[in-house]
Amino acid sequence: QSDVGIVKKTNQDSYCIFTANSKKYGNILFAVVCDGMGGLEKGELASATVVKRFSNWFEKTFPILINNISPNFGIIKSEWDKILKRLNSDIGNYGLSNNISLGTTIVATLCVQNEMYVANVGDSRVYKVTDKVTRLTNDQSLVAREISAGTLSIEDEETDSRRNVLLQCIGASQKLEPEYKKYRLEQDAVYFLCSDGFRHEIKEKELLGLLSPKIISTERSINDTLLEIINLLKERKEQDNITCVAFKTMA
């Protein structure tokens, strides 16, 4: 689900979610959320370009890849790293030649054979919901660095005036350094990817109450719940675009 929100004229977020079934590897899920830079011109172009490039990879390159070799973290990381470095260069060059600033975050997940591979640039996130809410990515932001250094408390994270300052951004970083992680997929859990607009005005305790695997039973109930959360965020005057993609693993 994605919503322009109550302030911005355009939705600079982009996302995709695909499922596939392989005889060899069973059910496969691929999802991406990108947040085009707010305040930067053409943010929606940057985020849509990244989502399209990754969608093409999943639909065209990935089937050939898994036909020849078993997918593993090293191979997927290498594939994604090449795409991200090329995108950083392409979007950066487009900005230079058109004299505009543009960029985007990304969080991408590939679930295959009970494993989840994650790529992250910027401050879009992946969470896991079981009997608690667990964040699975680290923000590449100034505020996250200050928290890590102990100069800012985690309680002040959402209210700090510098919360939108990114240390890494596709199209605007001289040297792009994506973060890659591998997780074992947990049974009977809800996973979600989101742009920062989805999380500023809601507490993790509330997300647990709404997205608990005990409550979420079908694709429809996931979509209904995400719409409910988006409407709640708009009532709370969230200023940003709001995007979230969620899925549940079965028990």
Explain the meaning of each model-derived region:
Residues 1-251:
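PP2C/PPM-type serine/threonine phosphatase catalytic domain
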